[in-house]
Every structure is written in C-alpha cells, then in structure tokens.
Design a protein with these regions (language model features):
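Histidine/acidic-residue-rich, glycine-tolerant segments that coordinate divalent metal ions
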Residues: 1-83, 165-166
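Short, hydrophobic beta-strand segments
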Residues: 23-27, 86-94, 124-128
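Divalent metal-coordination and catalytic microenvironments
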Residues: 31, 45, 90, 143, ...
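Structural signal for hydrophobic packing residues in well-ordered secondary-structure cores
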Residues: 49-60, 111-119, 147-151, 175
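Flexible, glycine/charged-enriched surface loops at secondary-structure junctions
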Residues: 57-67, 114-125, 153-161
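A conserved active-site cap/scaffold subdomain adjacent to cofactor or substrate pockets
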Residues: 79-104
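Short amphipathic alpha-helices in soluble, non-transmembrane regions
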Residues: 102-112
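An extended, acidic, His-containing surface patch that forms the Zn2+-binding/catalytic region
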Residues: 125-178
Length: 178
C-alpha cells in the first residue's frame, strides 16, 4: 500500500505477461495389483512437473522476474487403480518476452520428450496468453501533473513489478495506458 496522499505509478512494465497451459497425459489404466500391465500417467506427470521446475532454476537468469507454477495436478478416482489420464495445469509469467518465448519452446520440447520416455501420449493446450501490461510514460506524467494541480501535496510513488497478469494488457498494446 502507498502512503496516504500518494499515487502509485509505474513508468513502464507493471504486470507480467502470462501463459496458462494444460498438459494432458494419456497412459493405459488398470488395477494397482498389475502395474506392469499399465502405463502410468501419474508417474509421467511427476517427471514432467520436476522437469518444468528445473526451467526456472537452471535456464532463467537468477535476477529475472520469472515464475512457473503447476497449480493443478489431477488423476484417478480410486487408490487402487492406475488411471488412464493425468492432467496438469499451470502458468508461466515473465516481464521479458525472450524469456517467455524460451519457456514456451522448452515446454513444447520437454513435455513430449518426457511422455515418450514413459510411454505416454502428451497434449499441450494453451488456456490463456496475456501480454505484459505496459504503461505509457508520457501519459503517466500527464496524469501525475493533472492530479498535482488538484492536490499539490500529492506524491508519486514508483511501484515495483507485480507478477500478476491482466487482460488490460491488450488495451495497453493498442492505446496509451496508465
């Protein structure tokens, strides 16, 4: 929160770009008493999850504002049955388009490779794709100056980046936004 009598403003990038994705892994279900007759998509999903976590740790600069989250991992309906499918849903977020492009390319390499290694089929679906929210510096300055005319004691506080995303980004790509 900003101190009373101030306005929070960001000169350029405000909210991260984000891509939501879903990975569906298809194996061969069966009874837990005969795992050798099955192809376990949960096992594949665990390996996909671990491989994707390594992207942030080993392929993104330590100072980059980048996040990859698997927030949902669903499979099966009984404790003694190996399911036929497993589904992982997640998001990638970054303030750098090159980093985001790298993560997307690696997602598309890693998931099929891991799936093949564990004899499952993989499908990747993009659920959402939201660009970075970019504020227009000139418009920001105009707004601050206009507000200071109304309230001379107003202080402009520069905000830090927020890893959240917002579809307002599409508007800020078309017209100057603040």
């Amino acid at each position: 929160p900003a101190p009373t009598g101030s306005i929070i403003i960001n000169d350029t990038d405000t909210l991260a770009g984000s891509m939501g994705f879903e990975v569906t892994l298809e194996g061969q279900g069966g009874h837990g008493s005969r795992p050798e007759k099955c192809i376990d998509p949960i096992n594949t999903g665990v390996h996909v999850y671990l491989a994707l976590q390594e992207l942030i740790a080993r392929e993104c600069p330590a100072i980059s504002e980048t996040a990859l989250t698997i927030g949902q991992f669903c499979a099966g309906s009984a404790s003694n049955v190996i399911p036929e499918t497993a589904v992982l849903q997640g998001t990638m977020r970054s303030f750098d388009e090159k980093t985001m492009a790298h993560l997307i390319a690696r997602l598309n390499e890693i998931v099929p490779s891991v799936a093949e290694a564990y004899r499952t089929k993989a499908e990747i679906e993009v659920i959402s794709d939201v660009p970075i929210v970019r504020c227009n510096e000139e418009l920001n300055q105009e707004i601050v100056e206009g507000l200071k005319e109304l309230e001379p004691e107003l202080k402009a506080v520069c905000a830090y980046h927020v890893m959240g995303s917002e579809d307002f980004a599409y508007i800020s790509q078309k017209i100057p936004a603040s």
